[in-house]
Regions:
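N-terminal juxtadomain amphipathic helix
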Residues: 1-7
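Short, surface-exposed alpha-helical recognition segments that flank or form part
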Residues: 8-11, 339
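Gly/Ser/Thr-rich loops at beta-strand to alpha-helix junctions
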Residues: 10-15, 19, 25-26, 30-44, ...
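Surface-exposed alpha-helical segments enriched in charged/polar residues
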Residues: 21-22, 209
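Short glycine/proline-enriched coil/turn segments at helix->beta-strand junctions
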Residues: 25-28, 51-53, 288-289
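Anionic-ligand anchoring segments at beta-strand to alpha-helix junctions in alpha/beta enzyme folds, i.e.
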Residues: 30-85, 212-251
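Non-catalytic alpha/beta scaffold blocks inside enzyme catalytic domains
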Residues: 66-216, 246-363
Length: 363
């Protein structure tokens, strides 16, 4: 089975890696899109430093909203295990990614063993018609809504009513919510940046801070992408900054607008795009003058790519270290269907071996 291509022609992996290295070495503004495990992220950041590239997550917008909450405003959060054991009121804020529906169902099936209350109550913040992840045993979440108002506006109204202030439109079922909070020992708000705007995340943290004036409350961050959040953590311990960092000036430079890789590609700033995705991804449109290097789980060359190298999927084709939202930390995973496909880190190291460590960085 072919695993590497230069253009549409099959090639040896070594030769394809050397060609990718030559393209990177001649690029004036390379950008990387990451969707990979911890080892792949670390290798990609090391390569970015060597060639002066900027790097971001493949779905950078959602991840940027989440990182901005922590870098710009700060957040009060709790671990998933503490949520399972202590949360007697669970508030689902907006829509959660599908991968977390099972976790919410487990919360509905269990009771907090470190709480005096032997039950959990569920609420959902969102517009009319919003639906919570399925709760087992026929349970439903009580909707807290301001009609068709946005999530941010609903959270603002919820916060105002909690503080006893007037609102232009009351939040539905607020009395039930206030009663549950009064009896709660530890309410937890589940949130994600996947479909939640930045101002809504900030307003949520304001509400949590208000609750902590008289009692305890916290939020549980459920990342829009587990790979993305793992990459953000790896980037932070390697450079001091999360994703959307660049090395164009020879040192790590964090700028969430400037190094928004999707924006850089759309505006024509980037002349080379290295996309690293250890899961199967559909072909993406690219600018005609921009070279594309694709490291992806694929059986054929990616359309329009100058170089394509097939890589395995973390936890499927090879062992890996990944971020786990169930534990709120990193964990190692075994290969579920081990194959001969190389890991992203292996290929990135191979590409880097063809680039001089003393190579001049772009201006």
């Amino acid at each position: 089975m072919a695993v590497a291509w230069i253009g549409n022609r099959e090639a040896l992996v070594e030769r394809a890696a050397a060609h990718a290295a030559a393209l990177l070495g001649s690029s004036r503004c390379p950008v990387f899109s990451l969707d990979t495990d911890i080892h792949g992220t670390r290798a990609a950041i090391a390569l970015a430093e060597r060639v002066g590239a900027a790097y971001d997550h493949a779905d950078g917008a959602a991840l940027s909203r989440e990182t901005a909450l922590f870098t710009d405003k700060g957040a009060m959060t709790v671990a998933p295990g503490e949520t399972r054991r202590r949360a007697d009121v669970v508030v689902i804020v907006g829509e959660l990614p599908q991968i977390y529906h099972e976790f919410v169902g487990e919360l509905a099936e269990t009771v907090p063993d470190l709480s005096a209350k032997n039950q959990r109550e569920f609420f959902l913040v969102g517009p009319n018609g919003a639906s919570a992840p399925p709760l087992n045993n026929g349970r439903t979440a009580t909707l807290l809504s301001c009609g068709e108002a946005s999530l941010g506006a609903t959270l603002a109204a919820l916060r105002a009513q909690y503080r006893g202030r007037q609102t232009s439109q009351p939040v539905s079922n607020f009395d039930d919510f206030a009663k549950a909070l009064a009896a709660a020992r530890f309410p937890v708000f589940l949130f994600s940046g996947d479909a939640t705007e930045g101002l809504a995340l900030e307003m949520l943290q304001g509400l949590i801070a208000d609750l902590n004036r008289t009692s305890r409350a916290s939020g549980l961050h459920l990342p829009a992408s587990e790979n993305g959040w793992g990459s953000a953590l790896a980037s932070t311990w390697m450079t001091g900054f999360p994703l959307r960092t660049g090395f164009a000036r020879g040192f790590p430079d964090f700028d969430p607008w400037r190094y928004d890789v999707a924006r850089m590609i759309a505006s024509g700033e980037a002349d080379l795009h290295l996309r690293i995705s250890s899961s199967i991804v559909p072909p993406q449109k690219k600018r005609s003058r921009m070279a594309l290097i694709a490291l992806a789980k694929t059986q054929k060359p990616v359309a329009g790519a100058a170089v394509t190298i097939a890589i395995g999927e973390a936890g499927v084709d090879h062992e890996a270290v990944v971020y786990s939202s169930r534990t709120g930390s990193l964990r190692s995973v075994d290969a579920r269907a081990k194959s001969e496909l190389p890991s992203a880190a292996t290929i990135i190291h191979l590409v880097a071996s063809h680039i001089s460590a003393e190579a001049a960085l772009p201006c």
